[in-house]
């Protein structure tokens, strides 16, 4: 039974997205449907966590907009994600970057991999 589930999940996993890690700055193109119209909206920020794995994998992106911290959690394999681009590779030593929530200004930056 477990093999059947894994087989079905393997078929549905997206392979068109680039690989990224926690600490990277990513730009996500999100499909937004307003009535009959559909448009793309960009959301750029730092990946602060990746959870689960396989088909149910999610990741959380944090950005500061107009002085207010905004976090959005996206399912990695969801069709609402039209595109994902890694803007900057970050160098971190943690899997979850919750400490960035308490930092302000330059202290909230992640070092870049050279």
Swiss-Prot record:
Record-linked InterPro entries: Ribosomal_bL19 (IPR001857), Ribosomal_bL19_CS (IPR018257), Ribosomal_bL19_sf (IPR038657), Translation_prot_SH3-like_sf (IPR008991)
Domain of life of the organism encoding this protein: Bacteria
Keywords: Ribonucleoprotein, Ribosomal protein
Membrane spanning residue stretches: none
Keyword Nucleotide-binding: no
Record Gene3D superfamilies: 2.30.30.790
GO MF entry, a single one: structural constituent of ribosome
BP GO terms, sorted: translation
GO cellular component, one term: cytosolic large ribosomal subunit
Family recorded in the similarity comment: Belongs to the bacterial ribosomal protein bL19 family.
Stated role: This protein is located at the 30S-50S ribosomal subunit interface and may play a role in the structure and function of the aminoacyl-tRNA binding site.
Protein's UniProt name: Large ribosomal subunit protein bL19
């Amino acid at each position: 039974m477990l093999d059947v589930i894994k087989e079905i999940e393997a078929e549905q996993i997206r392979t068109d997205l680039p690989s990224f890690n926690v600490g990277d700055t990513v730009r996500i193109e999100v499909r937004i449907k307003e009535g009959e119209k559909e448009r793309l909206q960009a959301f750029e920020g730092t990946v602060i966590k990746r959870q689960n794995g396989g088909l149910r994998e999610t990741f959380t992106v944090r950005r500061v907009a107009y002085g207010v911290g905004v976090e959005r959690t996206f399912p990695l394999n969801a069709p609402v994600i039209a595109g994902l681009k890694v803007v900057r590779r970050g160098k971190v030593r943690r899997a979850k970057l919750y400490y960035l929530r308490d930092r302000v200004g330059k202290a909230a930056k992640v070092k870049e991999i050279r």
